[in-house]
């Protein structure tokens, strides 16, 4: 990692998104810049027994997205999201047929894997949990795929005709950043010229909702779904569960230039830390997240004063938003008080491993379009969250350097720096 300044440079040349609201980067970006929220009462199952009954679900029809009958029947929603997002990224990049298959790889990220299908199929083979020994006669032949997240990378490799490095990253809520850093390392180290990388999670299921209910991490604001997610607001009381996927085509910069590809942004630096402290708790001083941000900026050769925008984790839990505020002050110094910071979780919820990939997509689009989406529902700022969290309304601004961060259960903290392609170091 210390040699990154002298290594090959990595740019994003394709983006594909499946998000609450619609499929594609255009509706995704329009929704964010309009400040529209996707939180609604959960429709995929009866959520009335649960404390939190709202979520940001994707309006996703796999058949309408061109998936085959086998893909519709056999694939978990997480896999379907990943496949469609990767397909969109490949089409956006125009790289198909222009890269050596042996120099093209795949990295997929997920926090929960195929949770929904595991939930459903266990109910089938165990007679709704009444059988101690499951009846495999009622199982499905592809049930094994639900247990191995690597099947997601395999399906995308077949789609991309990628015969190079492949793998999976599962690091909870930092998976979407961490998978991109691993993929970028493979390009920088010369193991690949092109990587298809991203993250997907579709975990709006009874077992997941019950888990977050148990630790009171999700909001019980069921009577106000559209305003339920309130990052940095005095009245915040938990996050909204979401779902989705974002995949990218990462290329070595010279390779992208040779084929005349458009580059959205350069992945200039990244770093991760763990607080080694608690599965769910965060230190109030934000030390580990601050260290990740500082290290990522150092690797990118970016001074804190040069950061134009910060994409916050912004989960709308009491402790996270205070933790982040402290981390930004610690890592950015006086500039923390003037740089715009916002959370798109206020609009699309928290899709676990996928969310920070969606946030990287939004960050790259900010550089492309020069607009900063707002933090929706931020009407009563917490006086202890006293930075510029871009309340309610998007802003036009020249953005050439972005920091995006993520915090995950287990104490994982990750940061990634995106810059305009070809920036002088």
Swiss-Prot record:
InterPro entries for this protein: Beta-ketoacyl_synthase, Ketoacyl_synth_AS, Ketoacyl_synth_C, Ketoacyl_synth_N, PKS_Beta-ketoAc_synthase_dom, Thiolase-like
Disulfide bonds: none
GO biological process entries: antibiotic biosynthetic process; fatty acid biosynthetic process
The entry's keywords: Acyltransferase, Antibiotic biosynthesis, Transferase
GO CC annotations, alphabetized: cytosol
Residue ranges annotated for the Ketosynthase family 3 (KS3) domain, each copy included: 7-420
Pathway(s) of this molecule: Antibiotic biosynthesis; oxytetracycline biosynthesis
Pfam families: ketoacyl-synt, Ketoacyl-synt_C
Active-site residues, Swiss-Prot/TrEMBL: 173 (for beta-ketoacyl synthase activity), 313 (for beta-ketoacyl synthase activity), 350 (for beta-ketoacyl synthase activity)
Family in the record: Belongs to the thiolase-like superfamily. Beta-ketoacyl-ACP synthases family.
Protein's name in the database: Oxytetracycline polyketide putative beta-ketoacyl synthase 1
Organism, scientific name: Streptomyces rimosus
């Amino acid at each position: 990692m210390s040699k990154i300044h002298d290594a090959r440079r990595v740019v994003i040349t394709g983006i594909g998104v499946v998000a609450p609201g619609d499929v594609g980067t255009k509706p995704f970006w329009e929704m964010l810049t309009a400040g529209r929220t996707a939180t609604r009462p959960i429709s995929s199952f009866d959520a009335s027994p649960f404390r939190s009954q709202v979520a940001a679900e994707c309006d996703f029809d796999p058949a309408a997205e061109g998936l085959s009958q086998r893909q519709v029947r056999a694939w978990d929603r997480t896999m379907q999201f990943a496949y469609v997002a990767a397909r969109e990224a490949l089409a956006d990049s125009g790289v198909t047929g222009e890269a050596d298959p042996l120099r093209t790889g795949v990295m997929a990220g997920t926090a929960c894997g195929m949770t929904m299908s595991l939930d459903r199929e266990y109910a089938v083979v165990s007679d709704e949990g009444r059988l101690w020994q499951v009846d495999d006669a009622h199982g499905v032949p592809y049930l094994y795929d639900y247990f191995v997240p690597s099947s997601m990378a395999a399906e995308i490799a077949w789609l991309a005709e990628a015969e190079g490095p492949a793998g999976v990253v599962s690091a909870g809520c930092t998976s979407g950043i961490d998978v991109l850093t691993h993929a970028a390392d493979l390009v920088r180290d010369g193991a690949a010229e092109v990587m298809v990388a991203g993250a997907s999670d579709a975990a709006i299921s009874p077992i997941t909702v019950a888990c977050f209910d148990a630790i009171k991490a999700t909001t019980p604001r069921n009577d106000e779904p559209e305003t339920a997610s309130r990052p940095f607001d005095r009245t915040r009381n938990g996050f909204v569960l979401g779902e989705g996927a974002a995949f990218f085509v990462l290329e070595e910069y010279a390779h992208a230039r040779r084929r005349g590809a458009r580059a959205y942004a350069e992945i200039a630096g990244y770093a991760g830390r763990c607080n080694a402290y608690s599965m769910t708790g965060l230190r109030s001083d934000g030390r580990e997240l601050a260290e990740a941000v500082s290290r990522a900026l150092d690797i990118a050769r970016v001074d804190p004063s040069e950061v134009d925008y910060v994409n916050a984790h912004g989960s709308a839990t009491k402790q996270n938003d205070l933790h982040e505020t402290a981390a930004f002050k610690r890592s950015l110094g006086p500039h923390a008080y003037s740089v715009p910071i916002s959370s798109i979780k206020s609009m699309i919820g928290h899709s676990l491993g996928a969310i920070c990939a969606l946030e990287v997509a939004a960050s790259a689009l900010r550089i492309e379009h020069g607009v900063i989406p707002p933090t929706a529902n931020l009407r009563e700022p917490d006086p202890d969250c006293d930075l510029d969290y871009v309340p309610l309304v998007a802003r036009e601004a020249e953005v050439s350097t972005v920091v995006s961060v993520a915090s995950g259960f287990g104490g994982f903290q990750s940061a990634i720096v995106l810059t305009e392609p070809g920036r002088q170091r």
